[in-house]
Amino acid sequence: MQLTVWTYEGPPHVGAMRVATGMEGLHYVLHAPQGDTYADLLFTMIERRDRRPPVTYTTFAARDLGGDTAELFKTAVQNAYERFRPQAMIVGASCTGSLIQDDPGGLAKGMGLPVPVIAIDLPAYQRKENWGAAETFYQLVRALAGPSAPPPGSKRPERAPGVRPKCNILGPTALGFRHRDDVIEITALLGKLGIDVNVTAPMGATPADLTRLGEADFNVVLYPEIASQAASWLHRIFHQPFTKTIPIGVSATREFIEEVAALAGVDAAPVLKANSSRLTWFSHSVDSTYLTGKRVFIFGDATHVVAAARIASDEIGFKVVGIGTYSREFGREIREAAKLYDVEPLITDDYLEVEAHIAELQVELVLGTQMERHISKRLGVPCAVISAPVHIQDYPARYAPQMGFEGANVIFDTWVHPLMMGLEEHLLAMFKDDFEFKDGAVPSHLGVGHSAPAVQTASSEPQPSAIETPSAAATETAAVWAADAEKELRKIPFFVRGKARRNTERFANENGVATITVETLYDAKAHFSR
């Protein structure tokens, strides 16, 4: 067990709640103590939903442990059914509730309720949130779509001539990163291809909708962390193929369109020709030193990290210096992606390890989760959020997908805005010491009679004799920078300053220099210019 102030994923029953909350007509009865009801806040405060999640807690207390907690659970199930009248119910235990081993599934099924009751048995101390969501969705699909499965060995009937192809969209849940807008974007894209959407699940689907999953010709998997297990089962039982390409970025969206068109037997050319993304042109039209070669570190769930690395490297021109994920179930995908960029993958759920890695790499942009936003703020590095878990500001009121051509536009704006433009940095460097433009200067339109606001400037504070860089903090033997050397370094143009810093530190370490001075800086320049 590890004590921490942050976790990338909650326990698996939170994943089950994400599925239940995203659906309609489904109710989740959770055998849990009073303290486990915090999960309501995730949906009402963080995602800002206008209703509570469809979850009933038994909320047993310490005094109940000496009595019949099984009867307490059965009462909660009966009351939940009578109050909400759902089409189906799922039952399970929280991580704490599983310790008393009351068997919620067996208890609920023995009650004879007139609706399907699906037991969700989640190993709370071995698995986490995304796995719990995937397992819950799989059990729902298997229980509700299974009865309409064709006989084993039978072939899937051909689609009648003139009938539009149909697909299911699988994977979006509550509390997902831009899932709501991604579904809208991909549904519109499929419509342009002449493909109808049979069911979108879990988000927006009812238990009755899940019984119709087998009617589709194929499945579109948007989030493999949630839907890959269910899609594999549908492929095996209903002979429905499913997509492998995640349409995040211009190139991936084009490949997705071609893949979907091949599965549906439609012509992709008109939609490919009508590419509405501005990312490609914008990334070529801005100042090349503003984007090209920026050192970027990417961390999050595997789906978004792999897609982001491709966009960063191939479509924007960043240099990917590190990628990682907190999801060990998808470690293989991250390791394969890391080989493409010749970097060492970071697979961990320890945010302190992630922070140390970011500091060591001396990156210029971080793409990650809410925690990487906090880390970047501490390190003074620009950051953009690309993956759950996220905070309130990443559930915007506006339309902001990540998928499709419009998603590529959103991604470009989101990633580029935190960066300082080349002209902006040059102007700040040129005028930061000017007597008219410093912080304490009187605004020119106020005249000489007004006093300047009292501002504590950095120059008025005593300066340390040496400034320690992130790399120096990372290792005890690394050289430190003298103040005059730091000042001289800032005279170097920003787009090569990072390289100059790294080369100088490397030169100092190789030659046993403890403190980097101005002379060391120029000696290193001469050394690497040979």
Swiss-Prot record:
Quaternary structure (record): Protochlorophyllide reductase is composed of three subunits; BchL, BchN and BchB. Forms a heterotetramer of two BchB and two BchN subunits.
SUPFAM superfamilies: Helical backbone' metal receptor (SSF53807)
Residues that hold [4Fe-4S] cluster according to the record: D36
Coiled coil location: none
Protein name: Light-independent protochlorophyllide reductase subunit B
InterPro entries in the record: ChlB/BchB/BchZ, LI-POR_suB-like_C, Nase/OxRdtase_comp1, P-CP_red_C, Protochl_reductB, Protochlorophyllide_Rdtase
Its biological purpose: Component of the dark-operative protochlorophyllide reductase (DPOR) that uses Mg-ATP and reduced ferredoxin to reduce ring D of protochlorophyllide (Pchlide) to form chlorophyllide a (Chlide). This reaction is light-independent. The NB-protein (BchN-BchB) is the catalytic component of the complex.
Alphabetical list of Pfam families matching this protein: Oxidored_nitro, PCP_red
Cofactor requirement: [4Fe-4S] cluster
Keyword Oxidoreductase on entry: yes
Family to which this protein belongs: Belongs to the ChlB/BchB/BchZ family.
GO biological process, one term: photosynthesis, dark reaction
Organism: Rhodopseudomonas palustris (strain BisB18)
Region ranges (Disordered): 453-472
Cross-referenced PANTHER family: LIGHT-INDEPENDENT PROTOCHLOROPHYLLIDE REDUCTASE SUBUNIT B (PTHR33712:SF7)
Record note on cofactor: Binds 1 [4Fe-4S] cluster per heterodimer. The cluster is bound at the heterodimer interface by residues from both subunits.
